[in-house]
Amino acid sequence: MILFFEYAIASGFEDEGILEEGKMMFNTLLNQFLEIDNVTSLIHKDFADDYKDFENLKIVEIEDDKDIEIKLNDILKNEKIDYALTIAPEDENILYNLTKIIEKYPVKNLGCSSNAIKVAGDKYLTYLTIKDYVKTPKTFKPKKYVIKKIDGCGGKFNLFDENFLIQEFVEGESLSVSLIVGKKIYPLSLNRQYIDERGFVGGEVNIKHRLKDEIFNEAIKAVKCIDGLNGYVGVDVIVNDEIYIIEINPRITTTIYGLKTEPSLAELLIKNANNEELTFKVEGKEFTINK
């Protein structure tokens, strides 16, 4: 039995853009997991009807997002779960806390460890951890900053608190690397990211690039800096004449919507959890997100 859920769908998240990305990731992996085994999933009552006709899927309905941790504990305590995977944001330690719950039980976590999430989920800790090993934009310690125009007048300024950090802007191509991390690190694909004023709005998966091997190598070097990364990991990079590591995402990313592997990504995650050698073929496609 596989326990698999996505936080936006489980919590009834109201932001349509976030929910759209959540559904893209959840539906992609859910269908793959169902080809392997029975699946139990936490799904908010507003979305449960969308999945009621799925065979071999047990739905645990959520009334309120405060119930998620309680229901997660109940399932792991009372059902025979072999593997568990949650897709959730790092914000407010959501992914960290859910992973800590999974780690209390004798199941195989298909995702990253809570210790790795603690580091990779914090942009400044990530910077401190990788800056001596890979090129990354100069980043200043989070504290209160005032930002104002050089020639401004009238006392106008913006004040940012300790929840923000200031980072050097690097011009270049916005790319990402999808990897599976275990006893070995397997690059799956190099991807182009579509980013505008709305944020991440899509991409092109498994692209060709003259620096592909070098980008893979830099991503692997960065991943090796953080203990406990496991399963699917996404690394954001900026490429110009050099390769800059921007962020390490210790979780499933929306890029998997455009990623097709043989065997499936779900099967690769399970093989990885069992310390098996991975061999695979990769195809990719372009996708967009409605925001």
UniProtKB/Swiss-Prot annotation:
What is the free-text note on the cofactor? Binds 2 magnesium or manganese ions per subunit.
Q: What is the effect of changing R251A?
A: 1% of wild-type specific activity
* UniProt source species: Methanocaldococcus fervens (strain DSM 4213 / JCM 15782 / AG86) (Methanococcus fervens)
Give all residue intervals belonging to the ATP-grasp domain. Answer: 104-274
Q: How does activity depend on pH?
A: Optimum pH is 6.7.
* Coiled-coil spans in chain: none
Q: Which cofactor does it need?
A: Mg(2+); Mn(2+)
What PROSITE patterns would the database entry show?
ATP_GRASP (PS50975), CPSASE_2 (PS00867)
Give the residues the record marks as binding Mg(2+) 1: D236, E247
Q: Where does Mn(2+) 1 bind?
A: D236, E247
- Binding residues for Mg(2+) 2, per the UniProt record? E247, N249
Keywords linked to the UniProt accession: ATP-binding, Ligase, Magnesium, Manganese, Metal-binding, Nucleotide-binding
Q: What is its EC number?
A: 6.3.4.24
Give the taxonomic lineage as stored in the record: Archaea, Methanobacteriati, Methanobacteriota, Methanomada group, Methanococci
Q: What does this protein do?
A: Catalyzes the formation of an amide bond between tyramine and the gamma carboxy group of L-glutamate. The enzyme also accepts phenylethylamine in vitro.
The biological pathway it contributes to is: Cofactor biosynthesis; methanofuran biosynthesis
Q: Per its record, what are the GO molecular function terms?
A: ATP binding; ligase activity; metal ion binding
Reactions catalysed: tyramine + L-glutamate + ATP = gamma-L-glutamyltyramine + ADP + phosphate + H(+)
Q: Which NCBIfam families match?
A: MfnD_Meth (NF040722)
Which positions bind Mn(2+) 2?
E247, N249
The residues listed in the UniProt record as binding ATP, with positions renumbered to this chain, are 131-176
Per its record, how is this protein called by name? Answer: Tyramine--L-glutamate ligase
